[in-house]
Every structure is written in C-alpha cells, then in structure tokens.
Amino acid sequence: MQLRIAVMGAGGTGGYFGGILARAGADVTFIARGNHLAAMRERGLTIRSRLAGEFTVPVQATDDPGQVPPVDLVLFCVKAYDTSAAAAVIRPLIGAETLVLPLQNGVDTVERLAAVVGSEHVVGGVAMITSTIEAPGVIAQTAGMGKILLGEVAGGTSVRTARLQEALGNAGIPAEIHSDIRVAMWEKFIFICGFSGITALTRLPIGAILASHASSTLLRGVMEEAAAVARATGIAVPDDGVERGMALAARFEPWAGGSLYHDLTMGHRLEIEALNGTVVRLGRDCSTPTPWNFAVYAALLPYAEGVPVA
C-alpha cells in the first residue's frame, strides 16, 4: 500500500527527503510558502545532492494544510521556533493512524509537537543530513549520510516504526530504528550546539575553527557542557560522544558551516533558543554549569529574529 505523505516545511531537510520520496513515486504533498512554493508549483522541485545526484520532480504543493486530506505520514521539518504554530495548522492532516515524524533541531520539539497533535501520533526522528534551499524550488544537499534515525519516543521497538523504516527504505532513504531515540536526538543536539554555534559565533567555517587551538577548544567545551547537561537530565549519552563529535566535525569540508551560521549570514531568524539557549536553561535547572554555551547564546541572541535594527 502506498503511503500518503505530507511534508510540513519544505526547506533543506523536508525538501530533500520529500524530493527523494516523490522521485520514488510516493504520494507526497509539500506544505510551503512564498517564493519557494511558487517555484515548486511552476517548475517542480530540484534536488542537487552528493548522494542522490541532480534531478527535478513535479510536486504537489500548497500553503494550506486544510486543503490536504488526512495522510499516513507527516514529515515535520519546520524550524524549531515554528513548532507550536505549525503543529496547530497540521491538525487537518491527522487521521486515526497518522504518524508524525519530526526531523528538527533541538531536543524539546517532540513534547511541544505531541502537546498539540497527541503523543500517540508522534515518533522520534533524527535527520542525518546537511541541506539548504539554494534557490526557490532548489534544494542543495552538501553533507551527511542522507539517513533517518527513528524510534518510539518512550523507547523500544514497534510494528509501526518497522513499517515506516521499510517504506522509507523502499523509496531510497536509509532508515534505522533506534531503541532509545532520545539518546540519538541528544547526540545530534550536542554536536550541532558546538558545530553550528561556534561557526555562527565566529562567522567562520569549520576548517578555520579546527585550525585554531583556541577556537577548537571552545568547540569542544560547548559540546562537553551539552553532554554533561544530557547526563544530568537522565540521558545516557555515550562517554565518547564528544570525541566522536570532534572527529565528525573534522570530516566536513573545511568551508562547511552549521545551520546557525548559514541563517546568520543570510539575515534569517536563528534557532538559538532551541540550541545553546536550551543547554543554558536545562543546565540551570539541573545545576550544571554552562558558561561556554551561555557565551554563544548571549552573543547570538540579538540576531534571534534576524539582523537587529539599531
């Protein structure tokens, strides 16, 4: 049986995975807005990918989820700061058996999403991908494995996650079931707080960060603090997680930067509250010091709504 899929947020992540699904013949509707929506309607969606090559597919796209009948799967890919508002408008897409798979930055978006659509509909997800909107209607994938990690939020395995894994795999998206998806979510969170936070803070790509002992020490310190907060809140992140994070950073192209870096340079809103700001808040709650993350948060907070006006 072919899944009916809606992609809420057709940016880098949603656009890439939705495009792969559409190329495989899945029934996909993209929820988008502005020039990106207009370009997709007029010319289709173009994917330029190191993994999947370059292709263009005609797509169904709308800015109104109310025009889309209930679906089997919602890929929920909006920016973290839009989570609650976007969750409210996808209600028409939710049927009795609908799964909602969030592929977002941050570690508290699952709870905010579940509070609106119902926890019974939400499974945990992690997107192992680096991709951006290169131009309206065009998604550029530049790094990452193109893989999705998924699992029940409460842990363990289930028939529905196994079926979702199979459906994604059949469409050409590698998917792996994680028995404790919260650990996987935190592992990515720890990495991007460092990688994204420090490339944004310095306005420099990762190669320049790693070439400086002082800057790479800052990168490591941010990740170590986030890992300490994870453990203090009961998340069993691996002991070698920060070392693996540093090794992963070194495997990126030297010109690469994180999502905060790209959004900052484009004058867009920043997910700073969902990233380093969350480390600071949770650290305060569990009496875990986070001075490195506070410095990143404090320096970038004036840009949270875009370029500040003097």
Model-flagged regions — what are they?
Residues 54-138:
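Rossmann-like NAD(P)(H) cofactor-binding subdomain of soluble oxidoreductases
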Residues 39, 92-93, 115-121, 125, ...:
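Internal alpha-helical scaffold of NAD(P)-dependent oxidoreductase catalytic cores
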Residues 3-4, 72, 146:
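Nucleotide donor/acceptor-binding cores
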Residues 45-61, 192:
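N-terminal glycine-rich dinucleotide-binding loop that anchors FAD/FMN and/or NAD(P) in oxidoreductases
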Residues 1-49:
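NAD(P)+-binding Rossmann beta1-loop-alpha1 motif at the extreme N-terminus of oxidoreductases
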Residues 2, 169, 218-310:
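NAD(P)-dependent Rossmann-like dehydrogenase/reductase catalytic/cofactor-binding core
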